[in-house]
Amino acid sequence: MELVNEIVEARNFREAWMSVRRNKGAAGIDKMSVDVLDVYMPLHMDDIKQSICRKQYKPSPVRRVFIPKPNGKQRPLGIPTVVDRVVQQATAQVLNRIYEPLFSEHSYGFRPNRSCHQAINQALDYLNAGYEWVVDFDIEKYFDTVNHDKLISILREQVNDSATLHLIRSFLKSGVMEGGFVSATTEGVPQGGCISPILSNIYLDKLDKELESRELRFVRYADDFDIFVKSERSADRVMASVSRWLESKLRLKVSATKTKVVRPTKSVFLGFTFWKSTRGWECRPTDAAKEKLETKVKQILVRKRAAAQPMSYIFTKLNQVIRGWVNYYHIGSMATYLRDVFGPWVRHKVRVVIVKQWKKCSTIHKNLLKIKSIIKSKITDDAIYQASMTRLGWYRQCGLSTINYLLNPQVLALPRANRTDKSKSRPGLVDPYALYQSLRSPICM
């Protein structure tokens, strides 16, 4: 059975269709939404399959969009049409079945049942085994510079089917529409398509095999990879030889300024850096990762905008950001940061928004008395009155011990009434430190 027949096989194609529908996503240049697939695909599926088998399928150019990168620059994405996404997904599913058993155990990106956490734990294993010099590699614009001919040549080693190779090349050459104009794509695998992850892994699997043949300790997540060695001299030698190999064999350019030999404490990998405790090497979020979290919180709590929004909405938005960040970074050491720095900081900013929404001193006084009654506090009514009637600005007022005590973490975490559905309550503010502790508990580890 030729491989192209596996791609267009009914079950595989329907699985691809359902996958695209589940993942939603933006429309391509034809502006067709995912919702239209249920009507479009039954009418056109047979024609699409026949055109693929006859090497006549012509993908549309991808729609260029840009998303911000942590360093302030922008990452270009190519959004295929929803029909092209179905065909790409069907192709990717077949390629995954072929290549997944062949991929290196040191590759963690874009693979089933593999994660960033596993990659970080592998790096820690190397460090704790004594490989304490790190070669941080940076491939310049990897996804934009993959050589098409080289990729097809690599694919041909496992894919002996001209129709499948023709289909993949047609996606690589489909072009990019930006500002109403279509430009040709002579190199690169546009990020944003369903097939891009598997193709990028197939290309860099050659690197994995080369590093394994040299018996090097390495971890790769997509185009982000580190090599771990025992001495600085070995690290310098490895950096030079692997850089030459990448440029000569895979035609990829290694960044001379960003690729460097460092100690683990200066290494940055997948948002983590490393430090040595009495227990050995551990990981923790980088300062840049913390700054990104705090920036997102500030954007939600911009005072003028936040003061006009329901607190239940603000808490929902904050909880999404905090849960997402803590869930990702919880394998790292950050108890002190969450308990003593971030937690108190975010709660103070929330108190400012709450008090500002109350506006009048009389309203502040009334609500603080109500909270006192609920939590059965022994704080005096006079202290509450003084805190309510102060002439301090919002920010300094919310730093007063009385308001801090009454609007404490437990109070902020209380469920809030849902005005549209009285039978349901909306969650209060999640405690980042408590969430971290729950994820770090032995049951969760």
Predicted regions and their residues:
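Non-catalytic, polymerase-adjacent accessory regions of viral genome-replication enzymes
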Residues: M1-P42
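Conserved phosphate/pyrophosphate-binding and hydrolysis machinery centered on Walker-type P-loop NTPases
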Residues: E6, D30-D38, P80, G109, ...
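Short acidic (Asp/Glu) and glycine-rich catalytic loops that position anionic groups and cofactors
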Residues: N23-D30, P70, Y99-F103, Y131-W133, ...
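Conserved polymerase palm-domain catalytic core
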Residues: H44, S51-F66, P70, L102-K266
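Electropositive, glycine- and tryptophan-enriched low-complexity nucleic-acid-binding patches
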Residues: Q88-H106
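A conserved non-catalytic segment of reverse transcriptases
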Residues: K173, K249-I314, V321-R323
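Right-hand nucleic-acid polymerase module
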Residues: V302-C361
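Extended C-terminal regions of large enzymes
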Residues: W345, W358-M445
